[in-house]
Amino acid sequence: ACATKNQRCASWAGPYCCDGFYCSCRSYPGCMCRPNS
């Protein structure tokens, strides 16, 4: 399963974001999926 908007993700080990989202690690407490612009 892939992670969608505002769900936790890990760019190095998974879970990976769904198509159309990228893993952003700028927010606390960890990485979250954000929509691609």
UniProtKB/Swiss-Prot annotation:
The keyword Secreted applies. Binds at site 4 of sodium channels (Nav) and inhibits the fast inactivation of cockroach channels. This toxin is active only on insects Has a potent activity against S.litura larvae. The presence of a 'disulfide through disulfide knot' structurally defines this protein as a knottin. Coiled coil: none annotated. The lineage of its organism: Eukaryota, Metazoa, Ecdysozoa, Arthropoda, Chelicerata. One of its GO terms (molecular function) is sodium channel inhibitor activity. Its main location: secreted. Belongs to the neurotoxin 07 (Beta/delta-agtx) family. 01 (aga-2) subfamily. The record marks 8, 12, 22, 24, 26, 34 as: Pharmacophore. It is found in: Secreted. Pfam families: Toxin_7. This is Delta-amaurobitoxin-Pl1d. Keywords: Amidation, Disulfide bond, Ion channel impairing toxin, Knottin, Neurotoxin, Secreted, Toxin, Voltage-gated sodium channel impairing toxin. GO terms for cellular component: extracellular region. PROSITE patterns: MU_AGATOXIN. The keyword Disulfide bond applies. Expressed by the venom gland. The modification Serine amide is found at residue 37. Disulfide bonds join 2-18, 9-23, 17-33, 25-31. InterPro entries: Beta/delta-agatoxin_fam. GO terms for biological process: envenomation resulting in negative regulation of voltage-gated sodium channel activity in another organism.
